[in-house]
Amino acid sequence: MSDGWSRRSVLKSSLGLSLAGVSLSGTTETVTGASEYETLRQRWAQLLTGGDFDATQFEYQDPLAELDETAQDHWETMDTSADRDRLWSDLPIPASSSASASESNITDSYGRLQEMAMAYATNGSSLEDDSALVADIVDGLDFLYDRVYNEDQSQFGNWWHWEIGSPMRLVSVCALVGDELSSTQETNYTNAVGAHTGTPYEYTEYDVTSGGANRVDMCIITALRGAISGTDSTIALARDCIEESDIFQYNTSGGGNGLYRDGSYVYHKEIPYIGSYGAILLEGLGELFTVLDGTTWEITDVDHDVIYDAVGDAVAPFMYRGLMMDAVSGRSISRADQTDHVRGHGITATVLRLANTAPEPYASEFRSLAKGWIENDTWDSFLSDADVPDIANATAVLDDSTISAADEPVRHDVFHNMDRVVHNRSEWAYTISMCSERIARYEAINEENLRGWYTGAGMTQLYNDDLGHYTDGYWPTVDPYRLPGTTVDTRERSTLDGTHHPRPSTQWVGGASVDEFGIAGMEFDAEGASLTGKKSWLHLDDTVVALGADITSSDGRPIETTVENRNLHTDGSETLTVDDTEKSTTPDWSETLTDVSWAHLDGVGGYLFPNQPTLEAKREERTGSWQEINAGGPSESLTREY
């Protein structure tokens, strides 16, 4: 992934954009016969390029310029010599598992060819229909086929690059360059893809049943392989595989992956993930619906409503003014290029795409939700970092006066199957991230979320008018031992190298709601310590009441409960008032406060303490980098005040 903040700078693994060529009425033209193969290819190409749009409109100027610059740079730095052993000097191509180069370089090489192909096929690009460019693109495909990605090559390293990453990019390039490929080249490339992604039912390398977003991606790859090779049975395999999956069924087993009737979405068996893996699942389904709709292979033998209902039941509660909340985004919160607004914008684009094929009343609901999210995001404009196809879909909705933007919801939701609670008001929202014998305390894998120890330990997050609070360097700079809402043993923790998703043994975790109000409770025990206790929260109209009881520990170390820990960004000018006394705004201030009745932090809200406790308060400058919490993140140091 790129270290940049723009969605345009990130080539998403599922390659999901939106389709401008589908009418807003939610229907597509029904096609039959041999033309259907070309229809599928063209639809996928439109998903990537935006199809036919007015490239002179100012909204498209920046993304087109960025696409041109990226493609031109790839082209100029591409090695086209006859004796080359790689396409780009920084992406050596491994030939076996013993090579020092990573198999990810194969995927990245296909990715650069795809970006070049997108410029070639995008309306208004300075490289549109450039014959020299497309010749070098096809030459690059031939090189990768001859060198490493072919039907005779055994897989090595991470399976994903062989079965999803590289083939998704390869079939996308084929769809984009169209008639520039010979029949021999089409056969070679589709045979290579078929060898590594033979059936979407299972992973080729591990003979394990596929599921979730991976299943959807593999079905997309298979459908496009069939369209490129002109093989009806291959496209039918993709359709059958998605129809026979459990994606369109609620999980009723009481645990594990999938969507639940209460709106929960769990992935990796025990992680709340609608903001990441769940979003990718919806994105891929929107693409697959779009490509196959109205064709011989249209997806019909499923309950589409399970997916369409998920937008309102699983996604919308965790969307706040255009951002996707961290509580359901797992380890992705540690990624510099996947902030809450970036994730929210991606989901907005997905919902707009789903609206193109969804029936009423879903289609109107989706456009209304998306319009509200776009218009209410005053921190990070959707259009400022959108891709060309996303802009086409969004502007069609924004410019339509008959579509009303949805207001921020006033609702309370308890997600029993993933130990999450969200309390939405018109001007603020509040989430609680809990854990139990069902749901893990946190997830840390692939050297990501290295300090996420307490993100599921009753962590609370308040969303208000400061829409950049969790976006602006929060996770690399916040004290990971002092997340709001948590009660922790202050023992020193080790960085979470390896794979970690521990669950406690507690069962008493959940909540209940009446209309837009609710209560939540959590019995907790500390990982690696004797600390135990109980917590409850009452969610009212303008107040959240937090209670603690039976909090005990026998380890002899200090136990801390963090009431609040706000990101004051780089200036830290907000005033803290305690019992009518304004406290210092200098970053090094700290004080023991006794008999506290109330406190107020400008721009946030008030805090009442009926028992008049003793509190420790401080302001501090904290410095950290994304790389410290995610090995793949940028090393640049960030400093924020708290």
Spans of features found by a protein language model:
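Extended polysaccharide-engagement surfaces of secreted carbohydrate-active enzymes
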Residues: 288-642
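Alpha-helix boundary/N-cap detector
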Residues: 35, 39, 58, 62, ...
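Low-complexity, Ser/Thr/Pro/Gly-enriched N-terminal "stalk/linker" regions
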Residues: 16, 34-104
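Short, cationic motifs built from Arg/Lys/His that form the positively charged side of catalytic pockets
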Residues: 7-8, 40-43, 535
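Glycine-rich, histidine-containing beta strand-loop boundary motifs that form or position
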Residues: 14, 112, 433-434
